[in-house]
Amino acid sequence: MKAKRIVFKVGTSSLTNADGSLSRAKVKEITRQLALLHEAGHELILVSSGAIAAGFSSLGFKKRPTKVVDKQASAAVGQGLLLEEYTTNLLLKQIISAQILLTQDDFADKRRYKNAHQALSVLLNRGAIPVINENDSVAIEELKVGDNDTLSAQVAAMVQADLLVLLTDVDGLYTANPSTNPDARRLEKIEKISSELIDIAGGAGTSNGTGGMLTKIKAATLATMSGVPVYICSSLKTDALLEAAEETKDGSLFLAQEKGLKTQKQWLAFYAKSQGEIYVDQGAADALRNKGKSLLVSGLVSVSGSFAYQDTVTVYEEGSGAILGKGRVRFGELALKDMLKSNKPKGVVIHRDDWISLTPELNDLFAEF
């Protein structure tokens, strides 16, 4: 066994029939494989789409709805039906399942993040399989493209998983679209997610799902930066989950960073909302970018926005305007403006423990989080 704690993300296209409705046969097959992995000693979390697919026909819709309010209503009905399918099938294998519905706020708010982490830890320690989904009935923003790709990466980072598996209807990341380009080549191992790789991903997904390959690259970036390797592979083949757990089926493996971001750094990079901007001189920029130093008041050039002690701000280099990163400040903007007027400004504005460096590509990639 190569992994002990695995997060599987199963998308809508991997759970539905041709008409967009939930396929009970596909759910049963997924739970069969989960049960075998569970018996082998793996700790498992399933991030599952499919609530809308499970519920829309019960409300009289002839096909999967497109309006947000109709999606929300369908998800409200379908979430219970979807969980019932998972619960019934897993109970036949004497395995307890548990439902957890999350929104972005559960990650952005530190207290709620801690509560979610503790609940998941207890469930895993007790041998249950948490089944996680976006709370689609209330979380409008989470109905955007790629929500559960992102969610699975956030969960994998939260529980410090050994592997995140993104199951989809294609068998990995290609150099081009394999359905239109016969010369497209699958990338089997990715050591670093570059801007070129992001450009390759492009595109959107199928009509039933909401996740394209670009959203999976975002998810892979978040997870690998947090120390979790990611495997993208097809769910269409027999024993897809079993083979993915061993990384033996065709797919694309994204290697984790050797030193994954700790929880505080993850929060700064992916969830903390910036309340202001600080511009620094070249010396301070070099200290932040290349030397791992704290930001001192003496390096400040200008301050804008409205922020207080412990708020998060974005820091830029004066002149070039290049983003340097984000951090939690030790002074509010009014105090900093007063310090800038001083002849000899002193003090630490952002300690290096409260700082995360960001490239322009990473900042753009996570702008929607």
Swiss-Prot record:
ATP binds at residues 9, 168-169, 210-216. Residues 275-355 form the PUA domain. Pathway: Amino-acid biosynthesis; L-proline biosynthesis; L-glutamate 5-semialdehyde from L-glutamate: step 1/2. The keyword Amino-acid biosynthesis applies. Disulfide bonds: none annotated. Its EC number is 2.7.2.11. It is found in: Cytoplasm. It catalyses: L-glutamate + ATP = L-glutamyl 5-phosphate + ADP. SUPFAM superfamilies: Carbamate kinase-like (SSF53633), PUA domain-like (SSF88697). Keywords: Amino-acid biosynthesis, ATP-binding, Cytoplasm, Kinase, Nucleotide-binding, Proline biosynthesis, Transferase. GO terms for biological process: L-proline biosynthetic process. GO terms for cellular component: cytosol. GO terms for molecular function: ATP binding; glutamate 5-kinase activity; RNA binding. InterPro entries: AceGlu_kinase-like_sf (IPR036393), Asp/Glu/Uridylate_kinase (IPR001048), G5K_ProB (IPR041739), Glu/AcGlu_kinase (IPR001057), Glu_5kinase (IPR011529), Glu_5kinase/COase_Synthase (IPR005715), Glutamate_5-kinase_CS (IPR019797), PUA (IPR002478). It is an enzyme of class 2 (transferase). Substrate binds at residues 49, 136, 148. The keyword Lyase does not apply. Belongs to the glutamate 5-kinase family. Catalyzes the transfer of a phosphate group to glutamate to form L-glutamate 5-phosphate. This is Glutamate 5-kinase.
